[in-house]
């Protein structure tokens, strides 16, 4: 039973998502046309909810969207594990398919695969590799190779991307990612994160590898008028009432 007008502290969807029509259309177009995208804004402005919405809208028989959050990754190795697991899992519809893709495309790495109770959704990959070896390029090429094999396009969305700035030898790692990803034709990337200053530095500093990597989108505040409509609508949906005037006062008090 839903009796609370609003959802707090988590990504939202459906009726709990408001506005962002322009940004939704832009991201959807970029996804469908293979345009790399960088999404930048302060924390709690709805980046994750927006990207997840576009992921759902973009998914089709000819376009697969992969989503992963690397907030818990503290090293290159952990990044590669998370990246490979997400790409294999979210581009395959059958257990046999993703295991075959792992066998074919990661053969030089000999991945260790652990299955849970639900193999299609509950599995993890541990990669026996040296991050400095050329073999890691096989992991970064996974989206492109799978896309070409299936005759589709793939978009990889990476949340909390600013975490890579904390890795040891981060600049060398960034160079490796950029050098591989920028040459891919059937795979594109949407990179975003919650620490605006780090994201700005990664993508706006000329001396860093990801400078001018893609279409940079700065997420603006949602307008007061849209917030008022949303607040009033959510109150009505849960059997409550609030006037537009009072909703407007709330918006102004918290600076939207």
Locate predicted features.
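P-loop NTPase nucleotide-binding core
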Residues: 42-45, 49-154
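Short, well-ordered alpha-helices that flank and scaffold nucleotide-derived cofactor binding pockets
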Residues: 29, 56, 60, 85, ...
């Amino acid at each position: 039973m839903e009796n609370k007008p609003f959802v707090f502290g988590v990504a939202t969807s459906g009726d709990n998502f408001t506005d962002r029509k322009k940004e939704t259309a832009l991201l959807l177009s970029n996804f469908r046309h293979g345009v790399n995208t960088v999404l930048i804004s302060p924390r709690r402005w709805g980046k994750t909810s927006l990207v997840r919405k576009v992921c759902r809208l973009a998914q089709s028989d000819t376009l697969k969207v992969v989503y992963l959050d690397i907030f818990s990754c503290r090293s290159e190795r952990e990044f590669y594990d998370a990246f490979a697991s997400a790409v294999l899992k979210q581009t395959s519809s059958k257990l046999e398919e993703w295991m075959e893709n792992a066998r074919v495309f990661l053969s030089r790495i000999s991945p260790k695969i652990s299955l849970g109770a639900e193999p299609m959704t509950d599995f993890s990959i541990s990669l026996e590799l040296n991050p400095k070896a050329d073999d890691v390029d096989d992991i970064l090429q996974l989206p492109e190779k799978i896309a070409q094999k299936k005759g589709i396009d793939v978009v990889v969305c990476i949340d909390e991307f600013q975490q890579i700035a904390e890795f040891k030898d981060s600049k060398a790692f960034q160079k490796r990612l950029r050098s591989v990803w920028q040459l891919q034709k059937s795979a594109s990337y949407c990179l975003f994160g919650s620490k605006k200053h780090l994201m700005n530095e990664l993508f706006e500093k000329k001396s860093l590898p990801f400078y001018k990597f893609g279409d940079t989108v700065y997420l603006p505040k949602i307008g007061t008028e849209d917030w008022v409509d949303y607040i009033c609508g959510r109150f009505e949906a849960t059997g409550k009432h609030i006037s537009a005037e009072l909703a407007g006062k709330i918006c102004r008090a918290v600076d939207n």
